[in-house]
Regions:
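Predominantly a Rossmann-like dinucleotide-binding segment in NAD(P)-dependent oxidoreductases
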Residues: 1-49, 54
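Contiguous beta-strand/loop segments that form the cofactor/metal-binding neighborhood of enzyme cores
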Residues: 33-93
Length: 93
């Protein structure tokens, strides 16, 4: 599964640290929730990286959730770049 979710956000709470801002909490959580629904709530291994902006909150992140039997979810969210905002799932035996 690959999911992208992001667009240019100039304002609101997403870039305000004192208001709990950040791309993972504001946007990325939806990708995570979808992956958990697709893979049945199984606890994955998490590999993640991101970029902290001048405001002290994460502006982008890329996360890979690794599930049993070689299943993965690659999740990307960004608050400074317009992404495709789509999900692709792949089935294999």
């Amino acid at each position: 599964m690959i999911a992208t979710f992001g667009w240019v956000l100039n304002g609101g709470t997403i870039h305000k640290k004192d208001l709990g801002g950040g791309t993972i909490l504001g946007l990325g959580i939806y990708n995570i929730q979808l992956a958990q629904m697709v893979f049945g709530g199984e606890t994955p291994t998490v590999v993640a990286s991101g970029h902290m902006g001048e405001d002290g909150v994460d502006e982008s992140n890329s996360t890979t959730l690794i599930y049993k039997n070689g299943r993965t979810a690659t999740l990307i969210s960004h608050s400074r770049v317009e992404l495709n905002n789509e999900v692709c799932t792949y089935l294999f035996n």
